[in-house]
């Protein structure tokens, strides 16, 4: 039995109980727990050897196809070999071919039984008796004249199972050899009836001239005669290098020690060639084939078959050799093809595109000093750099292209009118009012729609977008115009940019008494970038110091040339407070729209537009202010806006009245979203809620990946020590009344530049009041909650007081920015500035056994102060730094300080002083960080 065996299997094989086997193993020094335990092959061999092998043969009634102790011979083999078997005289008893025993264990026979020369016609499957020591004293020196002729009268069996070779530990079964060996067993083989010296297949001399080198002498597992006819379970010493009269195993194949041996007591199945390896028991000697049995420890029993490599294998090997090595890792080599990746893609996504192993990309970046996991979002530069090293062109897909591809996967399009020219109808113009803060934009809209919106704004500053549609009576014709009011404060850049993209015409409001300001220039840039025509409204002409001509001259520098100066920009002087020239301004807007714009849309398609603003209402839930750009929005439609989706449950106009449908250029408030959409997100109507949910989920995942790639800190191995140092960090949780305000506040706060030592991090943001969940998060992360135009809800205030969480409320954005900036500056580590105190020259040195060297000094300037910091100068060269004046005396009295012009004695925390040295004292003063 080659390989491991269980105790109960051995007990069944040996015909004893498992307890007896366990006891016998314990006597042999082997610790085995139970009958289900396995023992190694050497242990099983020693166990069988201790039982003498007889019980094994009695228990095996038929040969086993997967026996572990040795290979058995098929019962049909003796019938095909009727010829007499040469060999020394032995007392051999033929056994029935129906029950051949297994090899190598042999049945117990009398030890003194000599070998018989009787013919062994049925003995091919009969185990050979062990030869006495006197019967085979050494190798038979018969000649080996090369290949021998086939044995007359003894045809080879058509198929036989050769025994396992010289390896007692082999777990593989021998392979059948139907074809005869081309090389005979060596030596003269007489015909039938002739005696020979090989009971197990003929003599095996140790060497044959011209066929093989001499076989080394020594122990050989599985070979050699056994003195006294004792059983030979699997191996033992083999003093003679020649033939093997193995009980139950047959002699080794003639020729040399690499030849295959025959089965139990029969002549070898083929001549021994030099092709098999040791352990190829029944293998043939033909070139290019393995031995019939396995080698030691499961290795193949012969030399592997070597074939010619295919062209594909050679090409793959060549390409692998030519593959680029990045960071010591061999990576695939591209042909310059373009790989499209989404923003925030991971190395797994990149590896999937190029059929590479993600682990190799991770290892390559790690060796280059970049620590990234396979599923972590990677920045665009890292992907492009890695792709360039492998000869790939990495193209990071823009968010717009990625969103378009996402919609195309659902057979949806955005931004195009369906149908032909006959389906398009005239729509009202969308006008955005832009300008610097406090220049009168909201007052102008109030005058147009006869409302008072400005008084409701905190500080008189518009902090969210307002969208209104008013009907203007122009020359007896009612013309609807949609107005969008944008903030003018510098923190609302993104909101102004959204207003410019969603508009048809921009009204630029400039105060005649203030002139062109930074946000005025920014509004001009946004409008020009969106290719939107601009109508300039010069406001506050009724105030003292107003100079409309000056405004025209200033705006000329930015490409806005008035029509009276030969340009194409329309300028209207107005007074929003007095209502002067408002109709002229509206007329200019209508004329500009009719003259230079094609304002048409298809109202019969599914609605599409943009979410101008969104907020969380306590009673109504998420509310989004949307502007319909094409199509008609109806109650009950399934909509998706950004990563929010839902079904339109209710629509409200600017007057608070319910509407059932909204046509193009109509702003309405939509109620029914499952979450708050982002300000500026595109919205569209889809057929089913399922499609809307899938689109929203994919957009949300894309946004998370992009955010992770943008906010992930690039930590290299060189910067790891500094990155692990403690840095001051201010965590914030932002809550506001609408999403646009929260977005603007976050951008303004993150734009505060204080120092690299402190970091501002917004860990959460949302629309609505401060909740207990926000307080718990702030408590766990040591964060401050910023509430903008909102208050704490319910028990959130009590929880915040109990947990020690600070909640700050603001209604004006620049107050929040100033206070957060001050808090960041207060978190800076202090910077100390050196302030000189005085200088003293050493005139004499006194030595003391208690305190060491005492310096007798004359204070030249300033003061000498006890415990002050000092440095020692010698010839204007600093000798020692960071010293301390440990003691200071004037005459014999201890003093705290000595002024200039006086002598003193002092000791330093430094003993190597000389006369003429100068002691300079200083103190460190904390400097305010800015």
UniProtKB/Swiss-Prot annotation:
The keyword Transport is annotated on this UniProt entry: no
MF-aspect GO terms: GTP binding; GTPase activity; translation initiation factor activity
G3 as annotated region, ranges: 485-488
Name listed for the protein in its UniProt record: Translation initiation factor IF-2
Gene: infB
Biased composition (Low complexity): 121-135
Positions contributing to GTP binding: 435-442, 485-489, 539-542
Known function: One of the essential components for the initiation of protein synthesis. Protects formylmethionyl-tRNA from spontaneous hydrolysis and promotes its binding to the 30S ribosomal subunits. Also involved in the hydrolysis of GTP during the formation of the 70S ribosomal complex.
PANTHER family: TR-TYPE G DOMAIN-CONTAINING PROTEIN, TRANSLATION INITIATION FACTOR IF-2-RELATED
InterPro entries: EF-G-like_DII (IPR053905), IF2_II (IPR044145), IF2_N (IPR006847), P-loop_NTPase (IPR027417), Small_GTP-bd (IPR005225), T_Tr_GTP-bd_dom (IPR000795), TF_IF2_bacterial-like (IPR000178), TIF_IF2 (IPR015760)
